[in-house]
Amino acid sequence: MSGNREFYFRRLHSLLGVIPVGIFLIQHLVVNQFAARGAEAFNSAAHFMDSLPFRYALEIFIIFLPLIYHAVYGVYIAFTAKNNAGQYSYMRNWLFVLQRVTGIITLIFVSWHVWETRIAAQMGAEVNFDMMANILSSPAMLGFYIVGVLSTIFHFSNGLWSFAVTWGITVTPRSQRISTYVTLIIFVALSYVGLKAIFAFV
């Protein structure tokens, strides 16, 4: 019985990491990309997102609750999984370890980012271009955001590989090998988008 629960918990964890959390990540990166066009373009994009109907319901049920489940169960997996990269020097095993490490970094980064933006907004702060520019004016915070964004993107991109295996999309060694390179390409592409947005605020 406990084995069945574990199976379904892991399936749900895998699903929520892509739908809706992963989709939200991509949407967030796209909105932040408007910063490269200037403060006015970014503020307009941010205002559009803030003006969505049922925004709070969407944030709670489509973003925060799935994210909390994925994060909590992900921490459990990170501290109970047996890492074998030291024993087997294969790229997939190292990616397995990095998935767990970046998951913890992502949790810290996202928690801090939510505090600095969403919680601050509820306390009266205006989330706009100037807010992010002020945050990233600190070299320490700039470094923190670079590491955080890259970790988040890697965790999502590499997680797509696990998602494909978990849901029976890639079942053969060849398809899984191809999937590894595809997800690494996705990581590089999204990293470019994320870093471009960060440096647009600097």
From Swiss-Prot:
Topological category with respect to the lipid bilayer: Multi-pass membrane protein
Record's function text: Di-heme cytochrome of the succinate dehydrogenase complex.
Subcellular locations according to the entry: Cell membrane
Self-association state and partner proteins as the record states: Part of an enzyme complex containing three subunits: a flavoprotein, an iron-sulfur protein and cytochrome b-558.
Protein name: Succinate dehydrogenase cytochrome b558 subunit
Organism (species): Bacillus subtilis (strain 168)
Binding site for heme: H28, H70, H113, H155
Family stated for the protein in its record: Belongs to the cytochrome b558 family.
Pfam assignment, any one: Sdh_cyt
Broad class of where this protein is predominantly found: membrane
